[in-house]
Amino acid sequence: MALNYERIMAHRPADIPVSYGERECIIYALGIGLGMNPVDPGELKFVYERAGLQAFPTMAVVLGWPGRMTDPAFGVDDRLVVAGDIKVVLHRPLAVEGKLLSRPRIKEVIDKGPGNAAIIQNTRDLIAEDGTVVATVDSSTFARKHGGFGGKVTDTPVPAAVPQTAPGQICDLPTPPNLALLYRLNGDENPLHADPARAKV
């Protein structure tokens, strides 16, 4: 299957209305491993509505997620697609409930060469009802074995340098074996998270 660069870049995803509340905040927090210590006030505030509930900041990742690239015209084999890096910029804190408009866009597709991946770079703004941008989510998707389509090869982002100082804070969260199954409840229905046979592809 050959990746169709022109078709992907010409695609204009529709805006996605988002409505969420306390339940979604709690499910997201449980899906990233919070609540493993059910008596820790630092975790309870994300998983219990009577503990001063807060939305975990990275919840912006799943709000208004545009889904996978399943249109056959894109020439992308969905079985070979995995999530890459994600950057979240919060312009203001996420409320524990609200209505937003997700505005996704495809920024670029980078060619890593024949036999390698194509990196699909996306961005989306989460826009409040008053028109202000609440968060911007930049992400990369790796389409394994889709390189060699003749696209750009030099625009790979440079990773941030590792700080040479001691960390300001350390967070150690265990990840239970069923965490991917819980995370799917946020709307990411990629079979990779639940189907062992699919994960072997």
Give the residues covered by each predicted segment:
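Solvent-exposed, non-transmembrane amphipathic alpha-helical segments
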Residues: 28, 45-49, 124-126, 154, ...
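Short, functional N-terminal and low-complexity linear motifs
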Residues: 69-71, 147-151, 183-190
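HotDog/MaoC-like acyl-thioester-processing domains
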Residues: 1-14, 64, 81-174
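A conserved, well-ordered hydrophobic junction motif at loop->secondary-structure transitions
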Residues: 41-58, 169-171, 178-201
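Hydrophobic, proline/glycine-rich low-complexity stretches
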Residues: 1-99
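A broadly conserved detector of short glycine/acidic/proline-rich loop/turn motifs that flank catalytic sites
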Residues: 24, 31-32, 174-177, 186
